[in-house]
């Protein structure tokens, strides 16, 4: 599917799962290099920047947080950008909410004639990247909210359940960072390459602004990771305390019942005439002795601060 948006003299061709004919037509229409066409056909390209005489190819992978049967996971979405002086081509395999939202805003502003800031395709790319990065910031904030909810559950005594929850959130953060870390190289290379490109030096502040947005995402990821580490340490500490308490109780119970078991076994040895087993009241005497031993053991444990 191909959607075309325009603002003033700038055209934006947005392709979703383009066919071979779509790609061939775009390559021919804008006189693109055959290697650019190959990039549009490929869906597994690492983030990179290639600058040609009249246009530039930018490949980025954007992490998106999606709901998968009640749990969340990070899914990578590759976007290919081709930037010319007066055109921008985007190619992707699936719909991305941030891009759909940006397209609606652009069409609305175009009809109302509100936005005077778009003078060439570089400005269009800048505002689209701002929208994409804002969507990523929203996803990280949602992950942070999940950590806050986990924190509440930890202090409600649900430490064992939170082990899996924290592990899932940790996986999200790892996937998010793995996908975005290479963006920095693209923006740094763009700052060097675009200084003498068809957009001119005036576009450099826009690239710096995009890089600043990336740095904001990186900083937010680091802060969220620190919160995760702190919560995991707290959860593990509380879980260890509970487990140690259970072990302590079981150990004390064993010490209490061990002498009782020993006393009871003395009166059940076969083949030996054991006294105090011939009369009915003897049974009550044995039980009384066992109770006295239990009370003494408990008293001793409390005196030693074991209970």
Annotate each predicted stretch with a short phrase.
Residues 25, 31, 212-307:
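Hydrophobic alpha-helical transmembrane segments and their immediately adjacent juxtamembrane loops
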Residues 1-192, 198-199, 209, 213-216, ...:
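Peripheral, non-transmembrane regulatory/ligand-interaction domains of membrane transport proteins
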């Amino acid at each position: 599917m191909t959607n075309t948006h325009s603002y003033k003299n700038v055209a934006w061709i947005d392709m979703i799962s383009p066919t071979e004919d779509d790609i061939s037509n775009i390559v021919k229409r804008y006189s693109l290099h055959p290697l650019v066409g190959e990039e549009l056909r490929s869906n597994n390209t690492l983030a990179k920047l290639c600058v040609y005489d009249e246009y530039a190819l930018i490949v980025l992978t954007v992490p998106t947080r999606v709901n998968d049967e009640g749990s969340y996971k990070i899914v990578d979405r590759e976007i290919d950008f081709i930037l010319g002086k007066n055109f921008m081509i985007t190619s992707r395999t699936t719909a991305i909410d941030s891009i759909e939202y940006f397209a609606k805003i652009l069409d609305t502003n175009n009809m109302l004639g509100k936005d005077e800031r778009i003078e060439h395709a570089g400005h269009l790319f800048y505002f689209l990247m701002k929208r994409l990065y804002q969507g990523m910031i929203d996803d990280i904030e949602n992950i942070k909210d999940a950590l806050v909810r986990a924190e509440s559950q930890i202090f409600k005594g649900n430490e064992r359940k939170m082990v899996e929850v924290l592990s899932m959130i940790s996986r999200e953060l790892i996937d998010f960072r793995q996908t975005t870390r290479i963006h920095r190289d693209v923006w740094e290379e763009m700052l060097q390459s675009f200084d003498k490109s068809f957009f001119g030096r005036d576009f450099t502040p826009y690239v710096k602004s995009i890089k600043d947005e990336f740095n904001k995402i990186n900083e937010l990821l680091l802060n969220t990771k620190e919160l995760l580490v702190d919560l995991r340490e707290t959860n593990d500490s509380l879980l260890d305390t509970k487990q140690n308490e259970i072990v302590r109780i079981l150990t004390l119970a064993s010490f209490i019942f061990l002498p009782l078991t020993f006393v009871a076994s003395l009166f059940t040895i076969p083949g030996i005439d054991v006294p105090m087993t011939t009369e009915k009241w003897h049974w009550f005497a044995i039980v009384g002795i066992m109770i006295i031993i239990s009370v003494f053991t408990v008293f001793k444990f409390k005196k030693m601060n074991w209970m």
